[in-house]
C-alpha cells in the first residue's frame, strides 16, 4: 500500500513540473504589454518601401514624353520626396549626357548602337512604339508600302498623284539629326543619310503640328503622340496600333530605352526610379500612355 501511495505522489510531482514548464514557455513567447513583437511576429508584417529623397535627372527622347510624364506622376505617389526631372532634348543628346555623367538616366527612342554600348551605355528596354507615317486629314492616301515611303523620303516620288493621291508636290517633314525617331525610321527603311527633307524639326510635336497645317505634307512621329489633327496611314496594309506593334505586324517600330552606364552606381533615388520603370507595375501606365510594354511584345 505504501508503495502505491509513493508512486502516486511521484506522478503528481511530475505533472506539476510539466505544467510549470509549459507556463514558462508560453510567457517567454508572448511579448509583454508595450514591448515590440518578436522576430517571428515581425516576419508576418509587410515592410513598406524605404522612404527616399533627392533628385533624379533624366534627359533624351521627346517621343518618350508621355511615358515619362506618366512614370514621374505615378512614382511620385510612392516616393513623394524624390523629384524626377525630364528634359526632352533628343535621344542622341540623352545618350551623350548620361555617358558624360551630367544626368542620371538617358532616354532613347531607338536601339543603342554598338559604338554606344562599347562606351559603356546599357540598354534597358521599357516599351515598344510604332513610328507612324502621318499625313494631313484631307489627304486621300490611306495606305503606303514601305518601298513607297522610302521613295518619297528620298525624293524619288515627289507628287501625291504617283501613289494614288491628289495632284500636289509632296512636302517631306522629318526630325533633326540625332533624333531617335529619325534614326529608327531611316534605319528600318534602309535610307540612312539619303532623305530629302523639305523641313526638319526638333520635336515630335513640331512634326505633327506642321503636317496638320499643310495638306501636301508627310512626316513620321511616335505612334503614342499621334492625335486627331493628322492621319496615320496604314503601312503594307497594316494600320498602326498598340496591337499591331505588340504582335510585330506593323513594320515600322522601335524600342523605348532607359539608358544607364555600365559600372556606374546610381543614387538610391535614381536606382529606385529605374527599378520602378523596369517593373511589371508600370505595364498599365505604359499602355495608357499609348506605348506597348516590352513584356507584351511578341
Language-model segments: what does each one mean?
Residues 1-9:
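Positively charged n-region of N-terminal signal peptides that target proteins for export
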Residues 4, 21-25, 30-32, 36-100, ...:
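Exported/periplasmic ABC-transporter solute-binding proteins
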Amino acid at each position: 500500500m505504501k508503495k502505491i501511495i509513493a508512486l502516486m505522489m511521484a506522478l503528481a510531482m511530475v505533472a506539476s513540473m510539466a505544467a510549470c514548464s509549459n507556463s514558462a514557455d508560453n510567457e517567454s513567447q508572448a511579448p509583454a504589454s508595450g514591448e515590440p513583437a518578436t522576430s517571428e511576429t515581425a516576419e508576418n508584417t509587410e515592410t513598406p518601401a524605404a522612404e527616399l529623397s533627392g533628385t533624379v535627372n533624366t534627359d533624351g527622347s521627346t517621343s518618350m514624353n508621355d511615358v515619362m510624364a506618366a512614370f514621374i506622376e505615378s512614382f511620385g505617389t510612392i516616393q513623394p520626396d524624390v523629384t524626377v526631372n525630364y528634359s526632352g532634348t533628343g535621344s542622341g543628346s540623352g545618350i551623350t549626357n548620361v555617358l558624360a555623367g551630367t544626368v542620371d538616366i538617358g532616354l532613347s527612342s531607338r536601339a543603342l548602337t554598338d559604338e554606344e554600348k562599347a562606351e559603356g551605355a546599357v540598354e534597358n528596354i521599357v516599351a515598344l512604339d510604332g513610328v507612324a507615317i502621318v499625313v494631313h486629314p484631307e489627304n486621300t492616301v490611306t495606305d503606303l508600302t514601305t518601298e513607297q515611303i522610302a521613295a518619297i523620303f528620298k525624293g524619288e516620288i515627289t507628287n501625291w498623284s504617283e501613289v494614288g493621291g491628289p495632284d500636289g508636290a509632296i512636302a517631306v517633314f522629318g526630325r533633326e539629326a540625332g533624333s531617335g525617331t529619325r534614326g529608327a525610321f531611316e534605319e528600318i527603311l534602309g535610307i540612312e543619310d539619303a532623305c530629302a527633307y523639305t523641313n526638319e524639326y526638333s520635336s515630335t510635336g513640331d512634326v505633327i503640328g506642321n503636317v496638320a497645317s499643310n495638306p501636301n505634307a508627310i512626316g513620321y512621329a511616335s505612334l503614342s503622340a499621334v492625335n486627331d489633327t493628322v492621319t496615320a496611314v496604314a503601312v503594307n496594309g497594316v494600320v498602326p496600333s498598340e496591337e499591331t506593334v505588340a504582335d510585330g505586324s506593323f513594320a515600322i517600330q522601335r524600342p523605348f530605352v532607359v539608358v544607364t552606364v555600365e559600372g556606374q552606381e546610381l543614387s538610391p533615388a535614381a536606382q529606385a526610379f529605374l527599378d520602378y520603370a523596369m517593373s511589371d507595375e508600370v505595364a498599365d501606365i505604359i499602355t495608357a500612355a499609348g506605348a506597348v510594354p516590352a513584356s507584351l511584345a511578341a
